Amino acid sequence: MRWLTVGLLAAIGLLQYPLWVGKGGWLKVWEYDRQLQQQKEVTRKLEIRNAGLDAEVRDLKQGYDAIEERARFELGMVKQDETFVQIPEKVPGK
């Protein structure tokens, strides 16, 4: 009877090994699930960035407001009849 119990436990162990550690085992499934969640997070961030870029491209194609804003802030341009005034920041200690 003792050998039968040991034999059955060994058989159960041999049957469980591929389930947990084998090629399609639970450990692999959990690892793939973790990788999938990470990739979904990366994809979500990229979709948000792409939506912002898409909105900016549409804005640049349709109107001059975005172009004017970029010219003013990034290139320091002013309109023809405007006067540019720059006020220097106060230096601490003076």
From Swiss-Prot:
Periplasmic side: 22-94
Listed InterPro entries: Cell_div_FtsB, FtsL/DivIC
Signal peptide range in chain numbering: none
A GO biological process held by the record: FtsZ-dependent cytokinesis
Primary location group: membrane
Membrane topology: Single-pass type II membrane protein
NCBIfam families per record: PRK00888.1
Record-given protein name: Cell division protein FtsB
Source organism of the structure: Dechloromonas aromatica (strain RCB)
